Structure formats: C-alpha cells, structure tokens
Amino acid sequence: MAGEQNIKYFNIKGRMEAIRWLLAVAGVEFEEKFFETKEQLQKLKETVLLFQQVPMVEIDGMKLVQTRAILHYIAEKYNLLGKDMKEHAQIIMYSEGTMDLMELIMIYPFLKGEEKKQRLVEIANKAKGRYFPAFENVLKTHGQNFLVGNQLSMADVQLFEAILMVEEKVPDALSGFPLLQAFKTRISNIPTVKTFLAPGSKRKPVPDAKYVEDIIKIFYF
C-alpha cells in the first residue's frame, strides 16, 4: 500500500472525484479535508493555493493544484500512464476526451429550468453520438481488454467514471455499445474498483439540491 496522501476540496464530487477515483484504483490511502465555509476556502487561497483554486493534493512534499496536473502525476507515479511515449500520448488523448464529457455533467446540477433540460439533451447526444461511438471503435480496433496496451491506465479509469456519470443522467446510454458494456463489467470487477464502488468508501454521491446549496453558500455568501 502506498503512502497516504492529503486532499483538500469540498465534500462533493466536483473536479476532485476523478482524483479520488485514480488514487482509489491505484490502492492509495488518502485523507480528505473538506471546506465547509467561505472563510476556510479564503484562508487557503491566501496561503497555499497557487492560482487560488481547488482541488489541491498534498503528495510527495508538494502542494499540487490544477486537476489535470494532479491526475497526470498520480498516473505516472502509480504506473497508469503507459509504458512509452506513444502509449502516454494515447492515454492523455483519451483522458482529455472523457474529461470534456464529464465537464458537461459537472455543471448540470447548477443549471435551472430550460437550460437544465437542454443540458440533459446535450449530455445524451454527445455521449451517444460522439464519445461512446469513439471509444466503442477504440476497443474494437485495439482488440484488448483496455484502451491502451493491455494493462489498466488512467484512460480506463476515467472512461469508467464517465460512463457511470452519464448513466446517472441517461440510464440507457450504453445500449447499442456492446464493447463498452463489456468494458464496464471488466473494470467494475477490478478489486480496488469494487472497493471504491462499495458503500462506505470515499466515493461521493450523486449531486443533489443540498450539494448546490452548500457550494453556492461557500462561493457567494
């Protein structure tokens, strides 16, 4: 088991969830420190946040900010970034695609009325019309159990997370994508993934009205 890491964020999914996933799948213990007030966040902004933004992860004597930088460091450290430069580039490419999809969903709870309805349609259309067909084809062409090479990578973890996020909004999103369905089953059976999916883990629940209220209070009141 790797050394414990310290992460600072809100007690929500947000941009930290991809980091939680990667640490958990790598089998890394991590401690969470949550912001519950605007004052707590402001204090950190004034002291250690390089760009006055979270998430932040304390790891190997560093205070890392910026989600992608954190993800790449964790992936490199725990052998989830491929065996050579070509695999590295492919993994980053696939990960960036899934991050684009996940960012569509992250903002969804904060929308209202017609804008929220339109965003749900956009999520469904882009998942089923752009991203899932692309990854279905990657799996078909590659012919392996994973997206790159034949071992688990950051790209697999993020695609799995993206699938779960989409299915929370569009339950039938994987219909018509048999290879992605099989991929989801394979990844869900990895022991560390099973553990993170189980009740009582540090995985955060689907955002609800309280989630939105808490974040608005911290940022705007």
UniProtKB/Swiss-Prot annotation:
- InterPro entries per UniProt: Glutathione-S-Trfase_C-like (IPR010987), Glutathione-S-Trfase_C_sf (IPR036282), Glutathione_S-Trfase (IPR040079), Glutathione_S-Trfase_N (IPR004045), GST_alpha (IPR003080), GST_C (IPR004046), GST_superfamily (IPR050213), Thioredoxin-like_sf (IPR036249)
Under the heading SUPFAM superfamilies, the entry gives:
GST C-terminal domain-like, Thioredoxin-like
Q: Which residues carry this modification: N-acetylmethionine?
A: 1
| Pfam families hit by this protein | GST_C (PF00043), GST_N (PF02798)
- Protein name per its UniProtKB record: Glutathione S-transferase
All copies of the GST N-terminal domain together span: 3-82
Question: What are the record's GO terms for cellular component?
Answer: cytoplasm
Tagged with keyword Cytoplasm: yes
